[in-house]
């Protein structure tokens, strides 16, 4: 009967472009794809005789997915390009089981110069600056701030955005005071050109910094010399060692993919003025039952790296190999940036060699990662708790409050083998009980899935009730996220937390688990829970201190602790109390107290 329903749904497919979605019997999203012709594309997944089943001509991954499929949905679009953009958005937001999700939602910094200014200076941005005479350099995947500091250390350029008289940088010979007309614009621009040349040629900057470090050491200014030494080390780390001579002073980008032993590696080179100025690599472990899709990866990689709100410095993108939607991506990027963008596969010459180099480095990154990390704990968690995903990206949640005061929530993130502190999040909460607080935190996180892709696993500090709550929110979001909860053992109806040795219980959608205190899986989950708890407690303590300080100000006005608590209970925070209408305050705490608040 179920397959009959699916067969009827197949008959409704139009001959237009669009996005299709496959669901299993539990209503979970299995796969998102795009099509130039929905009817032809979707029907190619199936064989219709004697009964509806997976087309044996497709890959094993696709056949397995189709055997699980009981329902499909589609969205028709005006063009295949629109369908591709929508497909990418769905994959990022919903993380379907059989799609590979690249988790790189970061925006990387650019160094730029605004030549509209009389005396231009270097600045950092992560977005497009809406001015006509901007020159960008980057993106820099690491060390942008240190590189900027190194430029300002050696080249005496203006550092402050606005300055009417010589500042401290002039006094220490780090600026030539253009604000006071102590240098002409022509001479200043000559120094700026030298600095730009050094930015594009790190070896030049290194030589200059090494000279400066030597002078500082000879003058026994060892502290400053040590700072320069550290900057030299950072710039050496930034350099991409390439034995390829790029004859022309071109700007272009290079992408390559490698896949080995269920690990995907992506690599990107940024080339400006014929020099590789930065490189970025990413490692993504893939479940054994998913075959990697080269076309799918290139689409995600290029669309995510060339979003509308960043500067596009190169008109040409070189890729290591051909992929199905290359021409379609050219069309999308050309429309997005209102100029011709080409995606090419070089066959010979220096461009071919640099693409080969990118691929070789992507392979080396896989070997390096597998030497350092074998993903054992992730594989054990997936097998033992029967998870859908290999839990490489884990978000862990905890709340903290003191009798309904300073209510906060916290989320920490663990990726592959380390904490990703750039993804930690703090939440000020309105509710006072643990259940409603966790609902508030998880709902706010789920609403952000379109901006920050969902993880593989949520780990909740709590029991079955909070596990069921998390399931409700994930089902509502439509995302593919596994859920575990960890609760402290209860003795005499009291929960006990003994760091590292507590007999915690693990709750999954499959049941409840009591593991030995020596079990590596339990110890790993405890480590995750303890970090979330530490982060939540720290945020709670800081919030409480701030609230106590503000509370003491109201107390100094002569308001009793009871009145202050009444105000907080009603308005939620001190800012709202001070902004409250006088009449409302009078109704709540009386005219005398209201006057004290508004007068101060």
From Swiss-Prot:
Pfam hit, one: UvrC_RNaseH
Localization, UniProt: Cytoplasm
Keywords of the record: Cytoplasm, DNA damage, DNA excision, DNA repair, Excision nuclease, SOS response
UniProt domain GIY-YIG: residue ranges: 15-100
Molecular function per GO: DNA binding; excinuclease ABC activity
InterPro entries linked: GIY-YIG_endonuc, GIY-YIG_endonuc_sf, GIY-YIG_UvrC_Cho, RuvA_2-like, UVR_dom, UVR_dom_sf, UvrABC_protein_C, UvrC
GO biological process per UniProt: nucleotide-excision repair; SOS response
Subunit and partners: Interacts with UvrB in an incision complex.
Free-text function comment from the UniProt entry: The UvrABC repair system catalyzes the recognition and processing of DNA lesions. UvrC both incises the 5' and 3' sides of the lesion. The N-terminal half is responsible for the 3' incision and the C-terminal half is responsible for the 5' incision.
Descriptive protein name: UvrABC system protein C
Organism (species): Campylobacter jejuni (strain RM1221)
């Amino acid at each position: 009967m179920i397959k009959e329903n699916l067969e009827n749904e197949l008959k409704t497919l139009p001959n237009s472009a669009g996005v299709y979605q496959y669901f299993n019997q539990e209503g979970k999203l299995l796969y998102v794809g795009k099509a130039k012709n929905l009817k032809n594309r979707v029907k190619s997944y199936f064989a219709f005789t004697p009964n509806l089943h997976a087309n044996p001509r497709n890959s094993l991954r696709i056949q397995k997915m189709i055997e699980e499929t009981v329902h499909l949905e589609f969205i028709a679009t005006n063009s295949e390009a629109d369908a591709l953009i929508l497909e990418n958005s769905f994959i990022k937001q919903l993380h379907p089981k059989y799609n590979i999700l690249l988790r790189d939602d970061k925006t990387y910094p650019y160094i730029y110069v605004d030549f509209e200014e009389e005396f231009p200076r270097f600045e950092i941005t992560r977005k497009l600056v809406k001015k006509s005479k901007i020159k960008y350099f980057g993106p820099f995947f690491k060390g942008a701030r240190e590189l900027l500091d190194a430029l300002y250390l050696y080249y005496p350029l203006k550092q402050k955005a606005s300055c009417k008289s010589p500042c401290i940088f002039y006094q220490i010979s780090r600026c030539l005071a253009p604000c006071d007309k102590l240098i002409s614009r022509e001479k200043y621009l000559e120094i700026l050109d030298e600095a730009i040349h050094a930015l594009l040629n790190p070896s030049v900057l290194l030589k200059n910094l090494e000279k400066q470090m030597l002078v500082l050491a000879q003058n026994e200014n060892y502290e400053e010399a040590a700072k320069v030494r550290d900057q030299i080390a950072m710039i050496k780390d930034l350099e991409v060692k390439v034995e390829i001579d790029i004859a022309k002073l071109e700007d272009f980008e290079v992408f390559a993919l490698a896949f080995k032993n269920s690990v995907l590696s992506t690599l990107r080179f940024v080339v400006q003025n014929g020099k590789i100025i930065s490189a970025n690599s990413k490692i993504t472990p893939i479940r054994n039952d998913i075959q990697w899709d080269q076309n799918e990866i290139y689409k995600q990689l290029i669309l995510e790296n060339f979003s509308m709100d960043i500067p596009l410095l190169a008109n040409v993108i070189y890729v290591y190999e051909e992929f199905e939607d290359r021409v379609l991506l050219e069309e999308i990027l050309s429309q997005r940036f209102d100029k011709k963008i080409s995606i090419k596969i070089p066959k010979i010459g220096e461009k071919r060699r640099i693409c080969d180099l990118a691929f070789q480095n992507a392979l080396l990154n896989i070997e390096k990662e597998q030497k350092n990390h074998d993903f054992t704990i992730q594989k054990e968690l997936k097998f033992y708790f029967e998870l859908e995903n290999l839990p490489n990206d884990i978000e862990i949640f905890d709340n903290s409050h003191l009798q309904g005061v300073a209510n906060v929530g916290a989320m920490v993130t663990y990726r592959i083998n380390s904490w990703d502190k750039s993804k930690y999040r703090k939440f000020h909460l309105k509710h006072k009980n643990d259940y409603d607080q966790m609902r508030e935190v998880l709902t706010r996180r789920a609403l952000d899935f379109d901006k920050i892709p969902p993880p593989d696993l949520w780990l909740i500090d709590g029991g079955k009730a909070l596990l069921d709550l998390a399931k409700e929110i994930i089902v509502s979001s439509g995302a593919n996220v596994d859920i575990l909860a960890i609760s402290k053992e209860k003795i005499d109806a009291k929960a006990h937390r003994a760091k590292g040795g507590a007999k915690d219980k693990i709750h999954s959608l499959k049941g409840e688990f009591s593991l030995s205190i020596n079990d590596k899986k339990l110890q790993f989950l405890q480590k995750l829970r303890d970090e979330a708890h530490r982060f939540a407690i720290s945020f709670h303590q800081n919030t409480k201190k701030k609230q106590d300080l503000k509370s003491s100000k109201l107390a100094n006005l002569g308001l009793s602790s009871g009145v202050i608590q009444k105000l907080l209970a009603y308005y939620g925070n001190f800012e709202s109390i001070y902004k409250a209408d006088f009449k409302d305050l009078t109704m709540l705490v009386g005219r005398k107290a209201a006057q004290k608040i508004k007068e101060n």
